[in-house]
Amino acid sequence: MHAWDPPASLSRALPLASSVLMLLLSCLWLLGAGPSLRLAPELLTEPWQVHRLLTHALGHTALPGLLLSLLLLPTLGWWQECHLGTLRFLHNSAVLALATGLLAVLLAGLGLSSAAGGCGYMPVHLAMLAGQSYYPGWPQRTLPPWLLPWLLLALTLLLSSEPPFLQLLCGLLAGLAYAAGAFRWLELSERRLQVLQEGVLCRTLAGCWPLKLLPTPGSLGELPVTYPAGVRPATPRPPYLASSSSWPHTDGFAQLPPGLGPGQLTWKNSERDLDWAGPSFASATPMWAALDEQMLQEGIQASLLDVSVQGSQNTLWSPKPSVSSLRLQQLQHMGFPTEQAAVALAATGRVEGAVSLLVEGLVDTEALVTEERSGPAHCKDTGVS
């Protein structure tokens, strides 16, 4: 979930849900099933017609509306499915389609009859686009992400008369409500997603070609794994993102990037590691909240380890190797600046001691920390080393 470009898995197989939706919309159009799926409030009183609240998104009665929906599925739908996972993409699409139908029926009951009576997948496209509160990898100096669904709404009105404007607006409002957390109680839990993805059907579809079920990024089944020291994975992995449970059991410098010794890690390296890991935590699913306490405890344990440095005798002006991105991130979450937090960690070697220095205001922003333990950090109070 880090770029607009399709990930590598897309070049090997197509996303299952979006591709099947394209086939389904085309088949229903050829069969002429659009009128029987349109959102008709007067028919919803019959028990067998309640399905229209959901299936109104699958029917089309106008060719321009169908072509626009089909065009957006391989462009927008594939990207969303790759970054949400197939199961979460299907779940979100169904929830937003149902919310759009209910909102349209509500407006029709209030006297706005044009809010219902149509069909088409465009309201779901608008809802999914508006429901993304932030777009990872969105290029800088371009249109703001919140403007995209409104531009798509205007484009739809220019190119097609189906569905009606109020029904499209209902889809957009449903997406905005989703982004605001109105449907959070309907979200699939990480445990539920894991159980579904470990099922026989999902595992079979995940290995199919050319259509493939994509796992949910960041789910328990997608957690990073730890590689033995000296063994590099086939695809590059960012430093400091290997499993934190390996810290107490592996060499202290096994997490450094290839070619960098303990004394060659500069402030820019640490900041670049934090920048890489930042979007991953920002867009993480609730699974990270459940593991937050465990990661904090392991980070504190790792900070208490006294790593002896075997290197040259010359003084190197760089942060201590024990200053890791995770500990810096813990202090950042507490509201401390990055530079001062790193200096305090290098001076004390402990998270608790760093917090004490920062709270008392003893850390100088211009301080440099040597690799040797006896080399004091330059603080405002010369008595602190």
Swiss-Prot record:
MF terms in GO: serine-type endopeptidase activity
Bilayer disposition of the protein: Multi-pass membrane protein
Record flagged with keyword Hydrolase: no
Gene3D superfamilies, alphabetized: DNA helicase RuvA subunit, C-terminal domain, Rhomboid-like
The protein, known as: Rhomboid domain-containing protein 3
Gene Ontology CC annotations of this record: membrane
Chief location: membrane
Family matches, as PANTHER family: RHOMBOID DOMAIN-CONTAINING PROTEIN 3 (PTHR43066:SF16), RHOMBOID-RELATED PROTEIN (PTHR43066)
Magnesium recorded as keyword: no
Localization annotation: Membrane
UBA domain residues: 322-361
Keyword annotations: Membrane, Transmembrane, Transmembrane helix
Transmembrane regions: 13-33, 58-78, 93-113, 146-166, 168-188
GO biological process terms, semicolon-separated: liver development; MAPK cascade; negative regulation of natural killer cell activation; positive regulation of protein catabolic process; regulation of acute inflammatory response; regulation of protein secretion; response to xenobiotic stimulus
